[in-house]
Amino acid sequence: MPIAQQKDNYSPSCQFASIPNDEIFIHVLAPYLETSDNNINYYYDFSQSISEYTKTFQDLNIQWKWQPVTMLTFHEVIDNITEEKNKTGKLPIILNLCDGDEINGTPGISVVKKLHEKELIYTGSDEHFYRITTSKIPMKKAFDEAGVSTAKWESIPSKDHKINGIFNDLGSPIILKPSVSGGSMGVGIKNVVENKQALEEQVKLMFEGYRGWDLSIDGIVAEQYISGREFTTMITGSAQFPELCKVYKPVERVFHASLPDNEKFLSFDRLWEIYEDETPMPDNDNFYEYQEVESVLSTAIQELSLAAYKSVGGTGYTRVDIRMDEKTGRLFILEVNAQCGLSEDEDYTSIGAILRVNNTSFTQMITEVIEDALIRKATQWD
């Protein structure tokens, strides 16, 4: 199916629609982290999500349960789901929101492996997609191997790594990112560097971590900084069934006009409104706004996004971030995000803006995500 032919009137196939509502029970697994750090607590505040899922499953008239899990409890929680299935006879469907790297105490890949081991139906990333996108390094390698346009990059595996010639290879400026990180953690305006001294100083700071949070796992990625417009889109479905993937029309993230070009990106301080090292926008304006993308460019972004998704063997759903070089007009994939945050609230995640532009409700999108999980499981059974 051509990407331009969006499933604007998407309805679930017989997989989900054919199962009576009273025979289904949805278990929403959410990562929980015990910490006294308010900044990190803010990042893991799911009160908005609970409200949205409450409404969604009321709309669908399906029983559900919100189940926080930690690295210490996920085995028991999943085992209990299996036991409950045997007692009630209801079909458990796991809406898995766990997105942690497990280095810093938040559950992630182990939950996926456990769900697979128990042969449960679960949404989102499988083990391969989770692993290849947890670190930017294997993800970038996959882009390069598939010929997917991405910014030039190099790995800095340790604080003692020799970085001579890196500006000759990547150009200037360079942006430094933790290889393993989510929600822009470890990324700030000082990460954009234009000379060797600034680069060495920032690398040293990054290897020291953030508030006890280790950001050095798998090192640091030094990347050509693409100055220009930024876009983001969403895909539901799995790369093994590209004809069933829904590639949403993208939105442009338009940063505040007062910002210089080398600050027009999602820094942790400004994204989460912490303002420890960076300043808010003048007159309390928004850091950025979302707007629709012109049709021809939108199609090009959708095509590139699907190619990137396929290159990493994407499953379930994803958010794809893209930049366009202001001088050449060339599009570059920044990253493909497995287990991205799901919300219709634009203040929480760009998914909300994407849903708005595509005239899609949160309930409809969640239905697509669940439908994909059922299709994948049905394929395994066949």
Model-derived features with residue positions:
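ATP-dependent carboxylate activation and anion-phosphoryl transfer catalytic cores
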Residues: 2-12, 242, 286, 291-382
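Anion (oxyanion) recognition and catalysis
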Residues: 58, 116, 144, 168, ...
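Active-site nucleotide/adenylate-binding loops and adjacent lid/helix of ATP-dependent enzymes
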Residues: 2, 15, 23-29, 84-88, ...
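Hydrophobic beta-strand scaffold residues
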Residues: 64, 121-122, 150, 174
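ATP-binding N-terminal substructure of ATP-dependent carboxylate-amine bond-forming enzymes
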Residues: 1-121, 128, 134, 138, ...
